[in-house]
Amino acid sequence: MDVRQSIHSEHAKTLDTQALRREFLIENIFVADEYTMVYSHIDRIIVGGIMPVSHPVEIGGEVGKQLGVSRLLDRRELGVINIGGAGAIIVDGQRHDIGHRDALYIGKGAKELVFVSNEASRPAKFYYNCAPAHTAYPTKKVSPADVAPVTLGDNLTSNRRTINKYFVPDVLETCQLSMGLTELAPGNLWNTMPCHTHERRMEVYLYFNMEEDSCVFHMMGQPQETRHIVMRNEQAVISPSWSIHSGVGTKAYTFVWGMVGENQVFDDMDHVAVQDLR
């Protein structure tokens, strides 16, 4: 388990490129036949990926020991979105078939967590966010057909994008975790611009659906102290509540967003005008 400490905004603005990447970038999300796990002190979120190829992958009691409990979800909830091939997640003996861009919410108290791919040649890529939970909500599958996509932006400003809200109060109940998927229209490059912060939540982005010769310049930092991190395909970045989180790519891309904190109202944002950025 890779543990990342919280960092003050005054400290963050003094960091060079390598130090920024070390603090906020998660480079290796998917490793064949393993799970990856990054524990952030910021709102205690855990971020990672699971890619079963030659055999199922189980998250067992070995993780619980690192968290001071018996199992991962003794005091946590889990959200998973599959950005790879078809697969399944077995939760306490019950199999949930999870296709490409399907999602599964798993509530507090689940013990058995096994992840499988249908085809080794096109393995599932289960990306997950895990947050502290105070009560147990039912495990539930959410498919793209279950969410009402919202299209924002304009081709003229190169930010036309479709937002799919998977885990929000209108779709299902969670303790604090919100997750969704945003896809840029072809030829569009900007996400979340004009940008915002939200004092009551932190956020993690996973960028994917990117070609090998493309990248995203992820903007972060306080609005008057902006920095950037260069992102490649299937990499994630941690955004503290004091930081903007926006990006511009060399080509269109898709990203999964996940938020934890005290407020699940999606529009609870502190907007920043473009002319106020530095």
From Swiss-Prot:
Its cofactor is Zn(2+). It catalyses: 5-dehydro-4-deoxy-D-glucuronate = 3-deoxy-D-glycero-2,5-hexodiulosonate. It is an enzyme of class 5 (isomerase). Binds 1 zinc ion per subunit. Keywords: Isomerase, Metal-binding, Zinc. Pathway: Glycan metabolism; pectin degradation; 2-dehydro-3-deoxy-D-gluconate from pectin: step 4/5. GO terms for biological process: D-galacturonate catabolic process; D-glucuronate catabolic process; pectin catabolic process. InterPro entries: KduI, KduI/IolB_isomerase, KduI_N, RmlC-like_jellyroll, RmlC_Cupin_sf. Its EC number is 5.3.1.17. Zn(2+) binds at H196, H198, E203, H245. GO terms for molecular function: 4-deoxy-L-threo-5-hexosulose-uronate ketol-isomerase activity; metal ion binding; zinc ion binding. PANTHER family: 4-DEOXY-L-THREO-5-HEXOSULOSE-URONATE KETOL-ISOMERASE. Belongs to the KduI family. Catalyzes the isomerization of 5-dehydro-4-deoxy-D-glucuronate to 3-deoxy-D-glycero-2,5-hexodiulosonate. This is 4-deoxy-L-threo-5-hexosulose-uronate ketol-isomerase. The gene is kduI.
